[in-house]
Amino acid sequence: MAHQAHSYHMVDPSPWPIFGAAAALLTTSGLVMWFHYNSSILLAAGLLSMLLVMLQWWREIVRESTFQGHHTPTVQKGLRYGMILF
Protein backbone atom coordinates (compact mmCIF):
# COMPACT_ATOMS: atom_id res chain seq x y z
CA MET A 1 0.00 0.00 0.00
CA ALA A 2 1.40 3.42 -0.94
CA HIS A 3 2.03 5.92 1.84
CA GLN A 4 -0.81 8.47 1.91
CA ALA A 5 -0.89 11.97 3.39
CA HIS A 6 -3.75 11.43 5.83
CA SER A 7 -3.80 11.07 9.59
CA TYR A 8 -5.67 7.77 9.85
CA HIS A 9 -4.37 4.25 9.38
CA MET A 10 -5.58 2.36 6.32
CA VAL A 11 -4.84 -1.34 6.73
CA ASP A 12 -3.85 -3.68 3.93
CA PRO A 13 -6.20 -6.56 3.09
CA SER A 14 -5.58 -9.35 5.58
CA PRO A 15 -6.56 -13.03 5.69
CA TRP A 16 -6.61 -13.12 9.51
CA PRO A 17 -10.30 -12.19 10.03
CA ILE A 18 -11.35 -15.09 7.79
CA PHE A 19 -8.97 -17.49 9.54
CA GLY A 20 -10.19 -16.19 12.92
CA ALA A 21 -13.80 -16.85 11.94
CA ALA A 22 -12.89 -20.37 10.80
CA ALA A 23 -11.05 -20.97 14.09
CA ALA A 24 -14.08 -19.72 16.04
CA LEU A 25 -16.34 -22.08 14.07
CA LEU A 26 -13.95 -24.94 14.75
CA THR A 27 -13.90 -24.07 18.47
CA THR A 28 -17.69 -23.92 18.78
CA SER A 29 -18.05 -27.16 16.82
CA GLY A 30 -15.48 -28.68 19.16
CA LEU A 31 -17.50 -27.53 22.17
CA VAL A 32 -20.61 -29.20 20.75
CA MET A 33 -18.67 -32.40 20.11
CA TRP A 34 -17.25 -32.28 23.63
CA PHE A 35 -20.67 -31.72 25.23
CA HIS A 36 -22.47 -34.43 23.24
CA TYR A 37 -19.82 -37.06 22.53
CA ASN A 38 -17.17 -36.36 25.21
CA SER A 39 -14.49 -35.90 22.54
CA SER A 40 -12.23 -32.92 23.03
CA ILE A 41 -9.96 -33.36 19.99
CA LEU A 42 -11.88 -30.89 17.81
CA LEU A 43 -12.05 -28.41 20.69
CA ALA A 44 -8.28 -28.63 21.18
CA ALA A 45 -7.74 -28.12 17.44
CA GLY A 46 -10.04 -25.09 17.49
CA LEU A 47 -8.33 -23.51 20.49
CA LEU A 48 -4.89 -24.16 19.01
CA SER A 49 -5.90 -22.64 15.68
CA MET A 50 -7.39 -19.62 17.49
CA LEU A 51 -4.12 -19.14 19.38
CA LEU A 52 -2.10 -19.37 16.17
CA VAL A 53 -4.34 -16.85 14.39
CA MET A 54 -4.06 -14.43 17.32
CA LEU A 55 -0.27 -14.69 17.40
CA GLN A 56 0.10 -14.21 13.65
CA TRP A 57 -2.32 -11.28 13.58
CA TRP A 58 -0.52 -9.56 16.46
CA ARG A 59 2.82 -10.19 14.71
CA GLU A 60 1.45 -8.41 11.65
CA ILE A 61 0.25 -5.46 13.75
CA VAL A 62 3.67 -5.12 15.39
CA ARG A 63 5.34 -5.27 11.98
CA GLU A 64 3.03 -2.56 10.60
CA SER A 65 3.60 -0.25 13.53
CA THR A 66 7.29 -0.82 14.22
CA PHE A 67 8.99 -1.65 10.95
CA GLN A 68 6.68 -0.02 8.40
CA GLY A 69 5.96 3.10 10.47
CA HIS A 70 2.19 3.11 9.90
CA HIS A 71 1.39 4.11 13.50
CA THR A 72 2.20 7.82 13.48
CA PRO A 73 1.62 9.88 16.66
CA THR A 74 -1.82 10.93 15.34
CA VAL A 75 -2.76 7.30 14.68
CA GLN A 76 -1.50 6.32 18.14
CA LYS A 77 -3.65 9.03 19.70
CA GLY A 78 -6.68 7.75 17.78
CA LEU A 79 -6.00 4.18 18.92
CA ARG A 80 -5.63 5.38 22.51
CA TYR A 81 -8.94 7.30 22.36
CA GLY A 82 -10.63 4.28 20.82
CA MET A 83 -9.49 2.03 23.67
CA ILE A 84 -10.56 4.60 26.28
CA LEU A 85 -14.01 4.98 24.71
CA PHE A 86 -14.37 1.22 24.38
From Swiss-Prot:
GO molecular function terms listed in the Swiss-Prot or TrEMBL record: cytochrome-c oxidase activity
GO cellular component, one term: respiratory chain complex IV
Alphabetic keyword roster: Membrane, Mitochondrion, Mitochondrion inner membrane, Translocase, Transmembrane, Transmembrane helix
Reactions that this protein is recorded to catalyse: 4 Fe(II)-[cytochrome c] + O2 + 8 H(+)(in) = 4 Fe(III)-[cytochrome c] + 2 H2O + 4 H(+)(out)
Pfam families attached to this UniProt entry: COX3
BP terms from Gene Ontology: mitochondrial electron transport, cytochrome c to oxygen
InterPro entries documented for this protein: Cyt_c/ubiquinol_Oxase_su3, Cyt_c_oxidase-like_su3, Cyt_c_oxidase_su3-like_sf
Top enzyme class: translocase
PROSITE patterns per record: COX3 (PS50253)
Chain ranges on the Mitochondrial intermembrane side, renumbered to this chain: 35-40
Superkingdom: Eukaryota
Mitochondrial matrix topological domain residue ranges: 1-15, 67-86
EC number: 7.1.1.9
Localisation: Mitochondrion inner membrane
Transmembrane segments: 16-34, 41-66
Membrane topology: Multi-pass membrane protein
Family the entry assigns: Belongs to the cytochrome c oxidase subunit 3 family.
PANTHER family: CYTOCHROME C OXIDASE SUBUNIT 3, CYTOCHROME C OXIDASE SUBUNIT III
Quaternary structure (record): Component of the cytochrome c oxidase (complex IV, CIV), a multisubunit enzyme composed of 14 subunits. The complex is composed of a catalytic core of 3 subunits MT-CO1, MT-CO2 and MT-CO3, encoded in the mitochondrial DNA, and 11 supernumerary subunits COX4I, COX5A, COX5B, COX6A, COX6B, COX6C, COX7A, COX7B, COX7C, COX8 and NDUFA4, which are encoded in the nuclear genome.
Annotated function: Component of the cytochrome c oxidase, the last enzyme in the mitochondrial electron transport chain which drives oxidative phosphorylation. The respiratory chain contains 3 multisubunit complexes succinate dehydrogenase (complex II, CII), ubiquinol-cytochrome c oxidoreductase (cytochrome b-c1 complex, complex III, CIII) and cytochrome c oxidase (complex IV, CIV), that cooperate to transfer electrons derived from NADH and succinate to molecular oxygen, creating an electrochemical gradient over the inner membrane that drives transmembrane transport and the ATP synthase.
Stated name of the protein: Cytochrome c oxidase subunit 3
Natural source organism: Anas platyrhynchos (Mallard)
